[in-house]
Amino acid sequence: MSSAPEPPAFKKEPPKEKDLGNIGLRGVRTTTLFRAVNPELFIKPNKPVMAFGLITISLCVAYIGYLHATQENKKDLYEAIDSEGHSYMRRKTSKWD
């Protein structure tokens, strides 16, 4: 009996060392103009700078929230002057209350 030749088994070879450098956008062929306009796509991320930026933006948002909260508290206050000339802060009252 003749046996049919066995089909070659497809072996998945591990990627070669030179192929690993072509992962992501760094391996895509682009023009020099595109790389000059979009350098952040091709530069390795700098984690300390990213952490500094995240902390800075978080502090800015917290400060804006703080200013908003203090402005809301001051909105209902006005400076009143008594008969002796002393000024003090007084909460606004409505005639309808």
UniProtKB/Swiss-Prot annotation:
Organism: Bos taurus
InterPro entries for this protein: UPF0708
Coiled-coil region(s): none
Bilayer-crossing regions: 48-70
Location of this chain's protein in the cell: Membrane
Keyword Nucleotidyltransferase: no
Record-level GO cellular component terms: membrane
Similarity comment: family membership: Belongs to the SMIM8 family.
Protein name: Small integral membrane protein 8
Membrane topology: Single-pass membrane protein
Ranges where the record places region Disordered: 1-22
Compositionally biased residues, Basic and acidic residues: 9-20
Keywords: Membrane, Transmembrane, Transmembrane helix
